[in-house]
Amino acid sequence: MKILFVLISILYAVYCFSSEEDVDSAYLANELEPVEDINSEQYAALEPKEEQERSCAGMGQDCKDDCDCCLNIATCNCWFGRYFCSCTFGDYQTCLRKKGKCKRNRPQSCPRSNLNRKKG
């Protein structure tokens, strides 16, 4: 069975290479016209579109307050008071504070850590 499979594979490979050579030689002899891609305009490079401003900032991006950060537990951490602010990881209390304070990007639920719970 294995020998039959190998034999069929070899015959198929020879057939593929021979038919490819026929097409190449016919193309070089101008017997075949080049095929035009009908959908070539579809794949043409389009003008780059301007990015729209996101409603929230991802981790490490600039922010003004906690409500600007996307994640439920993300907080806006600022260096030197109000300078160089960016979204960083917070905790469960951050999520609760955002739930009460934020109108946009308000967390639906706050994840609790499973580290302190006993399994048993």
Curated annotation (Swiss-Prot):
Localization in the cell: Secreted
Residue runs in coiled coils: none
Reported modifications of this chain: Contains 6 disulfide bonds.
UniProt entry tagged with the keyword Signal: yes
Signal peptide: 1-16
The keyword Disulfide bond is assigned to this record: yes
GO CC terms in record: extracellular region
Residue positions assigned to the propeptide: 17-54
Disulfide bonds: C56-C70, C63-C76, C69-C87, C78-C85
Gene Ontology MF terms in the entry: toxin activity
Family in the record: Belongs to the neurotoxin 05 (agouti) family.
Domain notes: The presence of a 'disulfide through disulfide kOR' structurally defines this protein as a knottin.
The protein's name: U13-lycotoxin-Ls1f
Annotated organism of origin: Lycosa singoriensis (Wolf spider)
